[in-house]
Amino acid sequence: MFVTLRDDINAEQRIADLEATLVRVQRQVKTAQARTADLVQAVYQGARDASTIAGTAKPVKPPKPRASKGSPEVALLHLTDTHIGAVTSSFDSAVAEQRVAMTIQKTIHLTNIQRKDHDVDHCVVILGGDLIEQTGQFPHQAWAVDASTFEQLFDAARIIESAVLTLLEEFATVEVYLTPGNHGRVGRGKGRQSLDYESDTNWDRIVGRIIGERLNAQTRLAWHPCESWYSIVEVGKYRALAHHGDTIRSFGGSTPSYGIVKKHQSWVTFMHFHDAYLGHFHTPMQLPMANGGRIFVTPSLVSDSAFAKEFVAAASLPAQRLHFVDPERGRVTAEYLVWL
């Protein structure tokens, strides 16, 4: 491609504009640390400015049509507890990005295996919360992160946006649901409940809004904004409850299996779902319900997590969850823990 002097000048100007925007927004964030509403507004303004200058992704070219065979199924990816920004002896933001990319590549690989028997043209993604680590969840957290909350937000948005765009290259349609986690709390508080701001304002929801706006041009993508602490995911006749899991209290340093089952047995009576998906406890588990459905607890991306080792006595092996769903019969037909 022939590049003119004008192209070089325009590119340099775009870089200069982006650098100026970054400096200005970082200055706004520093002056807004004590004022949560201003901090949130600064994040939104930074996202809009960056999108205006750098642009948003053009519509992804759909995959080539495949020869139809078998009864179609749907890939369901539970991507949760990515904790971008957290640092352990074997985990940081760069590792988080690598593991998200690995999750997507393994999802595509396992889908192609399924496609040898039947069509899998649609993918549903559940973003299960705790997308970032943030810096104000507990007192010493500033010593266990590699980026500010502001930087974590935009790293998470960039990483997850890239993941969704990759899925759009492989699936005819993609659908995304989001649920907020306790690490999304804005300001002081306990768990997900903030003392400084209403609970609807949550870093996970803000990340979701940034990504949703940036992917607005993707006509094959259905983006479901988070309206509550949970989402109901519908895949044909299959209906699932998705939530982070932090509403279920644990005591004595153990994963509260009884509490998990008890809560879901109550919720199913008026939410009417087959299965449930949650994270939060950083350990894999599945529990049966009386209605014949199951509760799937998905691990996190974090390895060597002090929380998992000290609080729930779990090994903290990084993994995510991929299921395949028969939308006509309303049931899961194949289950994978995607080890990372």
Sequence positions of predicted segments:
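Core catalytic region of metal-dependent phosphoesterases/phosphodiesterases
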Residues: 62-79, 93-208
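Conserved beta-sheet core of the metallophosphoesterase superfamily
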Residues: 168, 197-205, 210-228, 236-339
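Acidic carboxylate-rich catalytic motifs and surrounding loops in phosphoryl-/glycosyl-chemistry enzymes
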Residues: 174-182, 222-231
